[in-house]
Regions:
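Short, conserved micro-motifs composed of acidic
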Residues: 2-4, 8-176
Length: 176
């Protein structure tokens, strides 16, 4: 089917009546098709390992972000909430001498609130966290992108990144 798709995309790109933005989209799909076909012909080893009891809990953990030195992992954990049934908070785990992840610690206030924070992304040096927060009073939309700077061992008050990144819509999943 990849070859059939390639033929149709190539024919579309040659059409004089096709809109330029649609031609660009078709070219991107051609590139994706090339990657997919090559990836299937040349698989790479993939052996995921459980991160262990220091990170995993009875609820869900997701959106991990690791510092460039591979020594700290920041992630989102789904937790029970008094306001909502569930909400999300950030946790940090440190790599131990035996290469296991230490018991994750809640990042705490002012980053974590009784509202919803998710999809964190560390800066390379681990001194900034970019993340999504929803329903905050200063939000431009339902969810906005924020950042917090680390001062010693304490995370600073989250700052809304503002316009033009945040709009009246839903902004989420920042990647730094």
């Amino acid at each position: 089917k990849y070859d059939d798709a390639l033929q149709h995309f190539n024919e579309f790109v040659k059409m004089e009546t096709a809109k330029p933005e649609k031609k660009e989209e078709a070219k991107n799909l051609i590139a994706s098709r090339e990657f997919a076909k090559d990836a299937l012909q040349h698989p790479v080893p993939f052996a995921p390992q459980n991160a262990g009891a220091g990170i995993n809990s009875e609820t869900d953990e997701y959106f991990p972000s690791i510092t460039v030195d591979n020594k700290r992992m920041l992630f989102t954990r789904k937790i029970k909430s008094d306001i909502y049934e569930w909400q999300e908070d950030f946790y940090i785990s440190t790599l131990q001498q035996d290469s296991s992840w230490g018991k994750a610690k809640n990042v705490g206030a002012p980053v974590n609130t009784e509202l919803n924070e998710g999809a964190p992304s560390y800066s390379a040096d681990g001194q900034l966290i970019f993340f999504t927060a929803c329903d905050r009073p200063e939000s431009k939309g339902s969810c906005d992108i924020y950042y917090s700077r680390k001062f010693g061992d304490v995370w600073g008050k989250p700052i809304n990144i503002g316009s033009p990144v945040n709009t009246g819509a839903w902004e989420s999943q920042p990647s730094f």
